[in-house]
């Protein structure tokens, strides 16, 4: 069976913060970030389990980091 690779919430958050994203809101288990120079906002789910790598890569793409 294929085991899905995962990324921890804190790892992904660290990458975003280093790029200049900052926390603007928390709605339940979803953390929202904005950037001073980039459009839009990024939402990261913080659930009990780690994020699927596919989800983490999608978030990084939205942030302009992939």
Q: What residue ranges belong to the model's regions?
A:
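Active-site beta-strand termini and strand-to-loop segments that position acidic
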Residues: 33-37
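Basic nucleic-acid-binding interfaces
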Residues: 1-25, 38-66
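Cytochrome P450 catalytic-core helices
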Residues: 28
């Amino acid at each position: 069976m294929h085991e899905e690779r995962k990324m921890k919430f804190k790892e992904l958050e660290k990458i975003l913060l280093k790029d200049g994203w900052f926390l603007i809101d928390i709605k339940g288990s979803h953390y929202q970030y904005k950037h001073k120079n980039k459009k839009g906002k990024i939402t990261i789910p913080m659930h009990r389990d780690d994020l699927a790598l596919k989800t983490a890569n999608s978030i990084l793409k939205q942030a302009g980091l992939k």
